[in-house]
Design a protein with these regions (language model features):
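Positively charged, low-complexity terminal tracts
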Residues: 1-147
Length: 147
C-alpha cells in the first residue's frame, strides 16, 4: 500500500554549473499530510509516499533505502521522480516537517538533501517552503549566538 497526496507540490529540474537539481515547491495545504506520510515511511508502515503535482504533470515519490545508506538516491523516469532516503535524511526531513506543521511556517525558505543519480553523479533535492519566516540579519545572528 502506498500513500498518495494530490496537489502537494510542483517538481522542476534545474541545471546550475553542470549539475542537475530537483526543485520541489511544496503546497502549504499539504504539509500535514506529507508529514504524516514521512512518519509512516520512517516507521516502515508504508513503502512509499507519492506527492502529486498541482499541475498534474508529474509525481514525486519518497521511499526508504534499505541498509545503512548515507546518501539519498534520485531516480528519474519521464514524469516520475523517486527519491530514496537513508535513515538520517528521512529523520532530518521528518523533524523539519514536524516543526513546520507545529509552527505554521518553515524556519527557512528551503532545505537541501544531497543525493546521487543512477550514474553516481551528485545532485541535490531542494525542498522549497512558500510559507517561511523572514531571514535573520548577520547582526541578529551574532546577537543570538552571543558573538
Amino acid at each position: 500500500m502506498n500513500r498518495r497526496i494530490d496537489d502537494a507540490c510542483e517538481v522542476e529540474w534545474k541545471r546550475f554549473e553542470a549539475a542537475d537539481y530537483l526543485v520541489v515547491t511544496l503546497n502549504p495545504k499539504a504539509l500535514s499530510d506529507v508529514c504524516l506520510g514521512l512518519c509512516m515511511l520512517r516507521e516502515q508502515l508504508l513503502p512509499r509516499i507519492e506527492l502529486g503535482s498541482d499541475s498534474k504533470t508529474g509525481t514525486l515519490s519518497f521511499e526508504r533505502q534499505s541498509g545503512g545508506a548515507t546518501t539519498a538516491l534520485v531516480r528519474r523516469d519521464r514524469d516520475k521522480v523517486t527519491v530514496l532516503l537513508g535513515a538520517s535524511d528521512l529523520a532530518m526531513l521528518l523533524h523539519f516537517f514536524l516543526r513546520t506543521v507545529r509552527d505554521g511556517v518553515a524556519e527557512v525558505d528551503h532545505i537541501d538533501v544531497d543525493a546521487v543519480d543512477r550514474t553516481g553523479a551528485t545532485t541535490s533535492v531542494v525542498l522549497k517552503f512558500p510559507l517561511h519566516t523572514a531571514p535573520v540579519s548577520a547582526d541578529e545572528m551574532r546577537r543570538r549566538l552571543g558573538i
